[in-house]
Amino acid sequence: MKVVLQRVSKASVKIDDQVKGAINKGYVLLVGVADGDEQADIDYLVRKIHNLRIFEDESGRMNRSIEDVSGAILSISQFTLFADTKKGNRPSFTKAGAPEFATVMYNQFNATLRESGLQVETGEFGADMQVSLTNDGPVTILFDTKSAQ
């Protein structure tokens, strides 16, 4: 699994011009699933995301977690994180998980985030979405469970 985490001051996602999810301070997560990902990948990511200390404390140091600042998460499915651009000019997405599998894993990822005590808003898997966000920092972090092992 791959997750691009962006620290935001606000974010929202629209589908068919209707707001599907919105948050204030927190994270936007772009979530990509590959075939072969498993619950251990989800557990690793949720633990890292939940405990990550990238919000500033009173001294201005990145020392507070999303839970410490009562932040929320906007989770967006993003198969294009697995784009292969080695050949030609049109990316290939064959490394992305099959939609049936990726949907289950994406939903399980969000459920596990919620079970950890975090507020999670989502887009809709496979939908054409318009995501708006205001980066805070900016702070952007890439997680890849295959390179973490």
Swiss-Prot record:
Single biological process term from Gene Ontology: D-amino acid catabolic process
Alphabetized UniProt keyword annotations: Cytoplasm, Hydrolase, RNA-binding, tRNA-binding
Domain remarks in the Swiss-Prot or TrEMBL record: A Gly-cisPro motif from one monomer fits into the active site of the other monomer to allow specific chiral rejection of L-amino acids.
General function of this protein: An aminoacyl-tRNA editing enzyme that deacylates mischarged D-aminoacyl-tRNAs. Also deacylates mischarged glycyl-tRNA(Ala), protecting cells against glycine mischarging by AlaRS. Acts via tRNA-based rather than protein-based catalysis; rejects L-amino acids rather than detecting D-amino acids in the active site. By recycling D-aminoacyl-tRNA to D-amino acids and free tRNA molecules, this enzyme counteracts the toxicity associated with the formation of D-aminoacyl-tRNA entities in vivo and helps enforce protein L-homochirality.
Family of this protein: Belongs to the DTD family.
KW Hydrolase (keyword) present: yes
Keyword Ligase attached: no
Organism from which the protein derives: Leuconostoc mesenteroides subsp. mesenteroides (strain ATCC 8293 / DSM 20343 / BCRC 11652 / CCM 1803 / JCM 6124 / NCDO 523 / NBRC 100496 / NCIMB 8023 / NCTC 12954 / NRRL B-1118 / 37Y)
Stored NCBIfam families: D-aminoacyl-tRNA deacylase
UniProt EC number: 3.1.1.96
HAMAP family: Deacylase_Dtd
Domain of life where this protein originates: Bacteria
GO molecular function (one): Gly-tRNA(Ala) deacylase activity
A family per Pfam: Tyr_Deacylase
Motif, Gly-cisPro motif, important for rejection of L-amino acids: chain positions: 137-138
Protein name, as recorded: D-aminoacyl-tRNA deacylase
SUPFAM superfamilies: DTD-like
Description of how the protein assembles with itself and partners: Homodimer.
Subcellular location(s) per record: Cytoplasm
Annotated Gene Ontology cellular component terms: cytoplasm
